[in-house]
Amino acid sequence: MEVAAGGGCGAGPPLLLSDSEQQCYSELFARCAGAASGGPGPGPPEATRVAPGTATAAAGPVADLFRASQLPPETLHQITELCGAKRVGYFGPTQFYVALKLIAAAQAGLPVRTESIKCELPLPRFVMSKNDGEIRFGNPAELHGPKVQIPYLTTEKNSFKRMDNEDKQETQSPTMSPLASPPSSPPHYQRVSLSHGYSKLRSGTEQMHPAPYERQPIGQPEGPSSEGPGAKPFRRQASLIRSFSVEREPQENNSNYPDEPWRITEEQREYYVNQFRSLQPDPSSFISGSVAKNFFTKSKLSIPELSYIWELSDADCDGALTLSEFCAAFHLIVARKNGYPLPEGLPPTLQPEYLQAAFPKSKWECAIFDSYSESMPANQQSCDLNRMEKTSVKDVADFPVPTQDVTTADDKQALKSTVNESLPKDVSEDTATSKDYNSLKARPRSRSYSSTSIEEAMKRGEDPPTPPPRPQKTHSRASSLDLNKVFLPSAPAANSGLLPPPPALPPRPCPTQSEPVSEADLHSQLNRAPSQAAESSPTKMDAPHAQPPSKPIRRKFRPENQTTESQEPAAAVGGAVSAAMVKPHPTVQKQSSKQKKAIQTAIRKNKEANAVLARLNSELQQQLKEVHQERIALENQLEQLRPVTVL
């Protein structure tokens, strides 16, 4: 006896089922539908039926069942489209039966078409390994006993409600029998742990015994069923797309995620926040597009996928990512790396409002600002010179400053005046840099950020970190007034009383004239420093600033013919000075080691950026090649479609 299925559904082609096909397909459908409803109710298997229009098959078990058919992924995608499940977004009984028919046709060697299911076909075979053997879904009468008749099928969907209290997460779902159908209206949507996963399909022999289901479909409704009928097909379709990306979904990663892969756990949140902090220390600030691009490109996802993730996560479309937007983008990338296809829209659990409510600011301050507790809001930052002096010193000087070696009051006065002269230029440059940086964005953001966040983000993300500042010989600004060089003691100056410096400097005034040096003379030497930058080393340039006034003049008088004469007054005058200059010498060596480390870091960053750009170049070249081939194919088709002119 043959029964027509799907006559009035319109979701798939009309289908004729024999008795054996009815029983086999209904049992498989009941098994897959039971996972979606949390398991059937108690009762003997023989008394249960698949109620029409009350159940839909879960996407996860259906995907595992179809993979057990050992058909290529392309064929499975074609079957999913032909049966109508991809169009309606879920597997009803009609779509499921048509898909099984198409699988049987493909296994029989027939083309995957709707015409192939009209002829008589053997039952589909689903092969898996158990105890190093093969088990097939063979004759259902031998495996399952009495037959079950199915009435005509409809495409009504069952409404699922979800438990609101998420602490009641169960570790095991109720058992089910092979012929049992799910209850017509389940009380809630069971959240089942995926610790073991539905890694293999149970065989027909295993179906004789009730077994717990531990696989849960991914794309169930995110809220109560009162959302309205319009929201269901979208989410079911997203679930279907996720489940049937078999060619890109590693099966071994299925157990790494809970039943809601788009919900960020506490451990993941801490990791994402730490990554954000490495790019931007201020969590109330944001990461620019170029910094995020360089960071996310290291995931080795394709450029179209990264672009799509950016479109989903950048909720306000301003070309930058806040902390919540960064966490959403990072979570999408991690999910994609673990085999989950990207959703068609940003899931509710990744919306910025949800993440901000889930991760309050107090937690951020406690967990993240342990080493950044000195930062304060922008509305409390004053723009006076003393506050900006501290900021500039923090930005420019990356190493301890030997201020304890400055002994005279004249030197302190000169250093203070030098700092006051150089600071307005640095502050103006920082302001101009922040203005240029803000002008590059699509539209301005009203977020507050500290005075150092932009510069540190540019150093860490957009460009490789640069070594400590060096003398700019051709720069129009007085580079000798840089704070680093103000506090740097010179290496030759430490041994000024013992070894003569190189005799390359021009003759200078006699040492006897250098004892009473006024503050005006010191300022005149500071003004002459830029002109001497081309012929003197950085350590020699810094000598007039970091040492007593008498020492630079005495050191400069070193002609070749008067070297021995100059050593005697130098030893007499520099006796007290050499004791003060012994301590800064290890600091200079320490600075050189820091410079080497900074250079090595810059080289490593440049190599990483070069590798990223090289891979990006290869991907773009491949895309260009594919587009070129597509163009040639279209031109050939156009030539064939043109009318032939007969002369």
From Swiss-Prot:
Region (Interaction with RALBP1): 501-647
Biased composition (Basic and acidic residues): 158-170
The entry's keywords: Calcium, Coiled coil, Cytoplasm, Metal-binding, Phosphoprotein, Repeat
Annotated Ca(2+) binding sites: 314, 316, 318, 325
Polar residues bias locations: 524-539
Post-translation changes: Tyrosine-phosphorylated upon stimulation of cells with EGF. Phosphorylation on Tyr-residues induces its association with the EGF receptor probably indirectly through an adapter like GRB2.
Annotated positions of the Phosphoserine modification: 239, 480
CDD domains xrefs: EH
UniProt GO MF annotations: calcium ion binding
UniProt main location, coarse: cytoplasm
Domain EH: 21-122, 268-359
Flavoprotein is among the record's keywords: no
Domain of life per record: Eukaryota
Modified residues (Phosphothreonine): 466
Compartments where found: Cytoplasm
SUPFAM superfamilies: EF-hand
Ranges of Pro residues composition bias in the record: 499-510
PANTHER family: EH DOMAIN (PTHR11216), RALBP1-ASSOCIATED EPS DOMAIN-CONTAINING PROTEIN 2 (PTHR11216:SF64)
Binding partners and assembly: Interacts with EPN1. Interacts with EPS15 AND EPS15L1. Interacts with RALBP1; can form a ternary complex with activated Ral (RALA or RALB). Interacts with ASAP1; the interaction is direct and this complex can bind paxillin. Also forms a ternary complex with RALBP1 and ASAP1. Interacts with GRB2.
Physiological role: Involved in ligand-dependent receptor mediated endocytosis of the EGF and insulin receptors as part of the Ral signaling pathway. By controlling growth factor receptors endocytosis may regulate cell survival. Through ASAP1 may regulate cell adhesion and migration.
Protein name, as recorded: RalBP1-associated Eps domain-containing protein 2
Organism field: Mus musculus (Mouse)
